[in-house]
Swiss-Prot record:
The lineage of its organism: Eukaryota, Viridiplantae, Streptophyta, Embryophyta, Tracheophyta. Keywords: Cytoplasm, Fatty acid biosynthesis, Fatty acid metabolism, Flavoprotein, FMN, Lipid biosynthesis, Lipid metabolism, NADP, Oxidoreductase, Oxylipin biosynthesis. Transmembrane segments: none annotated. Its cofactor is FMN. The gene is OPR1. Its EC number is 1.3.1.42. CDD domains: OYE_like_FMN. Belongs to the NADH:flavin oxidoreductase/NADH oxidase family. SUPFAM superfamilies: FMN-linked oxidoreductases (SSF51395). This is 12-oxophytodienoate reductase 1.
Length: 376
């Protein structure tokens, strides 16, 4: 009898380990790999060491969102990030995607344009970066706490140029499907190009892409529509961060912005909407705040993913309280390739080393974090 009780206890699943239907995808658990820039794609081409990195973090029926992947030459703002605008890049992604699928994982490619978060050294022919504005960013201390990132004042896109950028997102989505990805996540967060258009503290336009909330969100929604029409809405997700101030992109009414976006997204029947918690105002700073994603969660009619400083207890609570369908983990997944298993067993976690997040080493801090079985 004692053995039977033990066996029953073993099959009791925590909320994070319960199955979830995400549109046409059947997920076996709710622990999602968040998109994580690692700067190990030399020359903007995905590398063979990424095969092991993503394979290590793949589980049967688990959702992985790939690192931010640049859609065009003008979208670059960091060294050694992957792209998906050339045939060579598409081919380089294929074995990485295959490795995830071999483990039964579901893999989305996050498609990205940095906008003004760049300088002319990254841009084709040394041109100025592009944005919704011509106001530049102030220099920033990089994540290593030493180097200073300098940004070239951007060139304001003309109204007639914007459809070309929308088209670049569409083509990138098509390329991602050609590479074998199950879908794409449109990067509309963290002060990059789409977020620059959405946020009223950045967007100072007077055309149909600026001013009102509807106008500021027009660019994002045109991209959603173009990408959904190209690859099918059930293969499209979007990430937004209405409350964040990353890269000097804040909004005076983030609650209204977030609600407008999710209500507008409802008509597209996307795979999911992925939202960064209000408590994550900047990349590394988790703060106490009274703002909540609950109104957005209630307004959105599809699968709702939350991210931002979650741990096991916090993630389970979000699911129990119906504040989310899925929970995305970043830093904990970097240092714990078997994070879902550790959560399931309530096992101790490896500590992450922030110093190796953005180095170019193909092993250290990338594929060398130990699994549970190698620690016993």
């Amino acid at each position: 009898m004692e053995n039977k009780v033990v066996e029953e206890k073993q099959v009791d699943k925590i909320p994070l380990m319960s199955p979830c239907k995400m549109g046409k995808f059947e997920l076996c658990h709710r622990v999602v790999l968040a998109p994580l820039t690692r700067q190990r794609s030399y020359g903007y081409i995905p590398q063979p060491h990424a095969i092991l990195h993503y394979s290590q973090r793949s589980t049967n029926g688990g959702l992985l969102i790939g690192e931010a992947t640049v859609i065009s030459e003008t979208g670059i703002g960091y060294k050694d990030v992957p792209g998906i605008w050339t045939k060579e890049q598409v081919e380089a992604w294929k074995p990485i995607v295959d490795a995830v699928h071999a483990k039964g994982g579901i893999f989305f490619c996050q498609i990205w344009h940095v906008g003004r978060v760049s300088n002319k050294d990254f841009q084709p022919n040394g041109e100025d970066p592009i944005s919704c504005t011509d106001r530049g960013l102030t220099p920033q201390i990089r994540s290593n706490g030493i180097d200073i990132a300098h940004f070239t004042r951007p060139r304001r896109l003309t109204t007639d140029e914007i459809p070309q950028i929308v088209n670049e997102f569409r083509v990138a989505a098509r390329n991602a499907i050609e590479a074998g990805f199950d879908g794409v996540e449109i990067h509309g967060a963290h002060g990059y190009l789409i977020d620059q258009f959405m946020k009223d503290q950045v967007n100072d336009r007077s055309d149909k892409y600026g001013g009102s909330l509807e106008n500021r969100c027009r660019f994002a929604l045109e991209i959603v529509e173009a990408v959904a029409n190209e690859i099918g809405s059930d293969r499209v997700g979007i990430r937004i961060s209405p409350f964040a101030h990353y890269n000097e992109a804040g909004d005076t009414n983030p609650t209204a912005l977030g609600l407008y976006m999710v209500e507008s997204l409802n008509k597209y029947d996307l795979a999911y909407c992925h939202v960064v918690e209000p408590r994550m105002k900047t990349a590394w700073e988790k703060i106490e705040c009274t703002e909540s994603l609950v109104p957005m969660r209630k307004a959105y009619k599809g699968t709702f993913i939350v991210a931002g400083g979650y741990d096991r207890e916090d993630g389970n609570r979000a699911l129990i309280e119906d504040r989310a369908d899925l929970v995305a983990y970043g830093r904990l997944f970097i240092s714990n390739p078997d994070l879902p298993k550790r959560f399931e067993l309530n096992a101790p976690l490896n500590k992450y080393n922030r110093d190796t997040f953005y180095t170019s080493d193909p092993i250290v801090g990338y594929t060398d974090y130990p699994f549970l079985e190698t620690m016993t």
